Amino acid sequence: MAPKAAEKKPAEKKPAGKAPAEKLPKAEKKISKDAGGSEKKKKKSKKSVETYKIYIFKVLKQVHPDVGISGKAMGIMNSFINDIFEKLAQESSKLARYNKKPTITSREIQTAVRLVLPGELAKHAVSEGTKAVTKFTS
């Protein structure tokens, strides 16, 4: 919990003179982990951001091999997929809760797809999903 404003003490003002010799901070040695003494700077590892960009690109090349996609359009497609997956997860979670089941199964996902996606798109998604689950289990 953050301290309240009333509890903070104001900083003490000291004269701008020389500090006594005994109060000077001592120089600290940096001890490197490798015994060779060579100091190599470690590269800062980037945080991995999970996106669907490579999969979007693969599907694009399957459907239209001669067509490209801009970075902005790829970002929009990635956001779209994240949004759809979020809606499907929420809906399947609700369905599992309604039926008092602790687990989201393929049945809940399938029903969520039928509820979230419109008409013909839902039919195609269900058939592709069923095909993928069958391939995965066999």
Curated annotation (Swiss-Prot):
There is a cross-link at residue 135 (Glycyl lysine isopeptide (Lys-Gly) (interchain with G-Cter in ubiquitin)). Can be acetylated to form H2BK6ac, H2BK33ac and H2BK34ac. Monoubiquitinated by BRE1 to form H2BK143ub1 and deubiquitinated by UBP26. Required for heterochromatic histone H3 di- and trimethylation at H3K4me. May give a specific tag for epigenetic transcriptional activation. InterPro entries: Histone-fold (IPR009072), Histone_H2A/H2B/H3 (IPR007125), Histone_H2B (IPR000558), HISTONE_H2B_site (IPR055333). The modification N6,N6-dimethyllysine is found at residue 14. The modification N6-methyllysine is found at residue 4. Keywords: Acetylation, Chromosome, DNA-binding, Isopeptide bond, Methylation, Nucleosome core, Nucleus, Ubl conjugation. Residues 1-48 are annotated as: Disordered. Residues 1-39 have a biased composition (Basic and acidic residues). The modification N6-acetyllysine is found at residues 8, 13, 18, 23, 29-30. SMART domains: H2B. The modification N-methylalanine is found at residue 2. Transmembrane segments: none annotated. Belongs to the histone H2B family. Core component of nucleosome. Nucleosomes wrap and compact DNA into chromatin, limiting DNA accessibility to the cellular machineries which require DNA as a template. Histones thereby play a central role in transcription regulation, DNA repair, DNA replication and chromosomal stability. DNA accessibility is regulated via a complex set of post-translational modifications of histones, also called histone code, and nucleosome remodeling. This is Histone H2B.4.
